[in-house]
Amino acid sequence: MEKNNSKSIRQNSKKGQPSGQPEPLSGSHKVKNRNHSRQKHHAHHDM
């Protein structure tokens, strides 16, 4: 139950906070950045 409580609090904080919406955006950005880095690496290999 304690574990669930912790999870609920974490989700609640995320949902309750206005930063919750931009959070997923940031995550997407991070993934995009990672992808970019990967592409860059690939380009280097091609070179």
UniProtKB/Swiss-Prot annotation:
Composition bias type Basic residues, residue spans: 29-47
InterPro entries documented for this protein: SASP_SspP
Region (Disordered): 1-47
Single GO biological process annotation from the record: asexual sporulation
Bias type Polar residues, positions: 1-20
Induction per the UniProt record: Expressed only in the forespore compartment of sporulating cells.
Keywords, alphabetical: Sporulation
Pfam families: SspP
Taxonomic lineage from the root: Bacteria, Bacillati, Bacillota, Bacilli, Bacillales
UniProt signal peptide: none
Similarity section: Belongs to the SspP family.
Localization of this protein: Spore core
Name assigned to this protein: Small, acid-soluble spore protein P
Keyword field contains Methyltransferase: no
